[in-house]
């Protein structure tokens, strides 16, 4: 939770420790189904060749599935707890709910007491590199628009579309499974160009142009220098 995050930050300061958190996709791995690492995208954005502001669309069309199979089931029927499961320990600080096999094991993400479905589970992995690409690590959206059915208090449901808008006009658009805009949706879109899945770009000779530009600063140097 936000409160727990604040307490972690306070403990780090109080004990004069080093702490860093983001995802590995800033560094080198291919960014899920996008078909490229983050580095050339960062070079392209920082070059200004796409213009500004930018819109980033995270959807199945651009290579990112939201795992809607991680939704919960309403009105679960209580079941006998398996003899090899300490259900009380599994619940931990979460409020007690009668055991049902769908509440634990591989499908626990579909219940608000333990997770938030594919959006909160995969969102950190999908959106952290985008914050980095857009240079938004030190800021937050000024407006969030959500198109989703009313959610059940226990079981996580689906959603259709979420739009984050920043004060400079940049947007991050999340499109839920089955609600994609369709067609050949660009992953990154600016007033001067577009980038699609597989690093297809509307800017001519983009790879040659990027080869002449400096690489972005490594993302792990600050931690190593602190150590």
Spell out what each predicted region is:
Residues 9, 41-45, 87, 91, ...:
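Non-transmembrane alpha-helical segments in soluble domains
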Residues 2-88:
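A contiguous active-site-proximal alpha/beta segment in oxidoreductase catalytic domains
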